[in-house]
């Protein structure tokens, strides 16, 4: 039997696409994507690292109040994401489906960023301070609910799986540079008030907030103009054929999505430990600057590990690589807690948790830096694998139900993320109260160090054990993620065939429409 010429041609195109040799992303787009990643990472790192510390220490709200605000906001954010996901999925503009949200949301989260790190003088009472915090946190997350649609561009900027995976690794590598500027905040906070009495700690935070907002906003606007969306989408008419209810049904039946959501949910508990970083460095070690000093070394291995992560994924698969990274991280954090944060020196009992001062100070600092470096080795591997696995979830949705529905899948995924944020946000505030910490300031408004053994041990326990638990659960749960190996290979081959057929059909329809218009005919819908 002689194969049909059109079938032979389709097979050739599928084979060519499977080889993944074609490059879709232009250099200018790559630069724009990386710059947007850089700007967003700066802002995200700054807000996540210092918002809680600033609001409790300078705005003056309690840890319990902060935790409740974040908890309630996260629940609201999850509900809001239902609407934003549907809107994003059904957006069709001349600029694409996702890019418009990169620019229209900037004023919202930009103004909210400034509010997060400002303490106006008219906020005299506790109630007014809480209201200010509520408005700032809600507005920031509302803007980010839509702005974060740009992250889905990662799966739409190129149809090439290999190019996409390389872009993921490159962007995660570039994110490392997005942590540098926020990392220097403690240095400026520690020394600027000593250099000039007119500059307080909170002035430094406010100044950095302006800088982060300008960087993130500027790179987002540039990215809007420089990037394109290339993966063929269902038309507006096709999207309307699928009801909102059916879209939700398809999303909730996506097994790989729920496994990944559950893994990310528990992995998010690491942020409870991260939320105590500023408290740990200031009170346990005696200076916020110690965190920056340690950070200069702990991040170095990431510049080596991130570029080789695609090779690990190619050899072991994204799922297996993520499992190994999670288990490794859990073991490392557990060992750090067992050894303690100040193992050197002659002191014992309560004095064991005083600070890093004295003859053992340097040795303790070297030790904690080495341990944090080891604990952080899987960080970038996990971030790259999470992005790759999220792409697998989108591809699975398209393969299973015929429509990518990325916005809605991302929305349902974000439910667990928001739930994790709600729980971790509540815990982050409550643990500060639970360990017995109360903020005290000097006459200039600068925070004084707490030397209570109970408080210091509490900070370290949260700092080390929460990340350990998070990493262990992340790795164990991903064992049940089924989009890998031969199943994934067969799925992607079938998807490539469908996409090529969709593009061919769209091309034929466009040619038929042009021909009918040229001949003065009225095009007839074939379905009618």
What are these regions (language model features)?
Residues 2-510, 514-525:
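Membrane-embedded alpha-helical bundles of multi-pass transporters/translocases
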């Amino acid at each position: 039997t002689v194969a049909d010429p059109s079938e032979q041609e389709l097979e050739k195109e599928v084979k060519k696409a499977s080889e993944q040799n074609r490059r879709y992303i232009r250099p200018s787009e790559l630069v724009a994507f990386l710059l947007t990643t850089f700007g967003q990472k700066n802002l995200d790192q700054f807000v996540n690292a210092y918002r809680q510390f600033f609001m409790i220490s300078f705005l003056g709200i309690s840890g319990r109040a902060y935790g409740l605000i974040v908890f309630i906001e996260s629940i609201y954010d999850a509900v809001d994401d239902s609407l934003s996901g549907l809107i994003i999925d059904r957006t069709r503009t001349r600029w694409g489906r996702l890019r418009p949200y990169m620019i229209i949301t900037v004023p919202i989260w930009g103004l909210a960023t400034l509010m997060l790190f400002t303490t106006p003088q008219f906020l005299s009472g506790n109630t007014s301070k809480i209201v200010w915090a509520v408005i700032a946190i809600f507005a920031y997350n509302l803007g980010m609910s839509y702005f974060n649609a740009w992250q889905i561009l990662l799966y739409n900027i190129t149809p090439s799986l290999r190019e996409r995976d390389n872009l993921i690794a490159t962007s995660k590598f570039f994110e490392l540079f997005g942590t540098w500027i926020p990392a220097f905040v403690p240095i400026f906070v520690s020394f600027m008030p000593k250099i000039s009495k007119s500059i307080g700690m909170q002035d430094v935070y406010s100044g950095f907030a302006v800088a982060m907002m300008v960087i993130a906003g500027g790179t987002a606007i540039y990215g809007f103009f420089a990037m394109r969306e290339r993966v063929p989408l269902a038309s507006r008419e096709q999207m309307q054929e699928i009801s909102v209810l059916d879209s939700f049904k398809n999303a909730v039946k996506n097994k790989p999505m729920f496994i990944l959501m559950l893994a990310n949910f528990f992995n998010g508990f690491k942020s409870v430990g991260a939320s105590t970083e500023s408290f740990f460095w200031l009170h346990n070690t005696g200076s916020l600057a110690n965190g920056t000093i340690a950070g200069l070394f702990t991040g170095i291995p990431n510049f080596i590990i991130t570029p080789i992560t695609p090779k690990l994924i190619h050899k072991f698969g994204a799922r297996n690589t993520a499992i190994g990274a999670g288990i490794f991280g859990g073991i490392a954090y557990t060992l750090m807690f067992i050894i303690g944060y100040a193992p050197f020196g002659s002191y014992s009992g309560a004095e064991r948790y005083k600070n890093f001062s004295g003859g053992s100070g340097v040795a303790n600092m070297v030790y904690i830096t080495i341990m944090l470096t080891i604990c952080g080795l899987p960080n970038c591997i996990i971030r790259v694998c999470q992005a790759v696995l999220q792409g697998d979830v989108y591809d699975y949705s398209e393969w299973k139900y015929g429509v990518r529905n990325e916005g809605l899948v991302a929305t349902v995924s974000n439910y667990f993320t928001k739930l994790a944020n709600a729980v971790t946000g509540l815990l982050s505030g409550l643990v500060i109260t639970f360990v017995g910490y109360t903020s005290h300031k000097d006459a200039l408004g600068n925070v004084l160090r707490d030397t209570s053994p109970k408080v210091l041990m509490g900070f370290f326990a949260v700092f080390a054990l929460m990340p350990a638990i998070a990493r262990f659960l992340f790795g164990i749960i991903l064992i049940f993620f089924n989009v890998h190996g031969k199943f994934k290979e067969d799925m992607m081959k079938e998807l490539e065939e469908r996409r090529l057929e969709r593009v061919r059909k769209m091309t034929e329809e466009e040619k038929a429409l042009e021909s009918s218009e040229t001949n003065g005919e009225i095009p007839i819908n074939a379905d009618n």
